[in-house]
Amino acid sequence: YRRQRQMCIRDRYGAFGLKPGTLNGEILLNLDSEDEGELYIGCAGGMDVTATLEYKEVAPEEGDVAVKVTLKGLRGGHSGLEINEGRANANKLLVRFVREAVASYEARLASWEGGNMRNAIPREAHAVITIPAENEEELLGLVKYCEDLFNEEYSAIETPISFTAERVELPAGQVPEEIQDNLIDAIFACQNGVTRMIPTVPDTVETSSNLAIITIGEGKAAIKILARSSSDSMKEYLTTSLESCFSMAGMKVEMTGGYSGWQPDVNSPILHAMKASYKQQFGVEPAVKVIHAGLELSLIHISEP
């Protein structure tokens, strides 16, 4: 039952299937609140952004060795409800290391695996890189430096972050250098986290993105992002920005699964009536909130404006 309920909430099948003209009323009250004493007056829309690229692998250089670096121990969390907490994104941390390893120690990227769900802040990521054998010790020093740095930067937010390295078998192929550099730059530049708070509800996130899943290896690269916003115009701005970022890296970018947000109206007459009625009934003011996740009301609002 719990799994079925979560599927229905996440996919909102009923609301997506609502046909225009089904409802006759002019005022819609949202009673969808998990906790008593709360009134929700807005929610985020979303869009799945997927960037893909195929390439022909090249062989590692003679005399190179392979090292697998693994980043784990992050808190992760829901990419809407907890995106405002500033939690670390494993993909965004790992790209900082990889970019420096390439620039300073002649490292080459063979593969990358990070994150597993679009709506979850990635907790783990790992990559296999090749490097001249004489640079291996310096690379291990960079791993330790980055582990200490990441823990210092996120000491007030994260549990201890683990960043380790181990020698692995040399892969048969790796990403060509020019494509590798473009991919790394795009991942590094990709917007992640909160873009803007709601001007009329300043303690609530309006627009955000989550660099959720990265898979690179065996001639294919795929990057999956979830963009959210209660403002449709800001959602379009964000997704266009993401598209531009990865298009410049030569990737094919697709937008799918989009749905509109429900922009809050703090001056709505029915909101004031609901607040007054609640206080009359229970003697306290209700908490008026906006959720940075999807609710059926955004879809109903589009169907029945």
Residue ranges and their predicted role:
Residues Y1-I9, H301-P305:
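Single conserved hydrophobic/aromatic residue that forms the stacking wall/gate
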Residues R2-R3, A90-L94, L238, I270, ...:
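Catalytic-loop motifs flanking and including active-site residues across diverse enzymes
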Residues R3-Q6, L109-W112, M255:
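Beta-strand segments within the central parallel beta-sheet cores of soluble alpha/beta enzyme folds
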Residues R10-D11, E36, I291-E296:
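Short acidic loop-to-helix transition motifs that present clustered carboxylates
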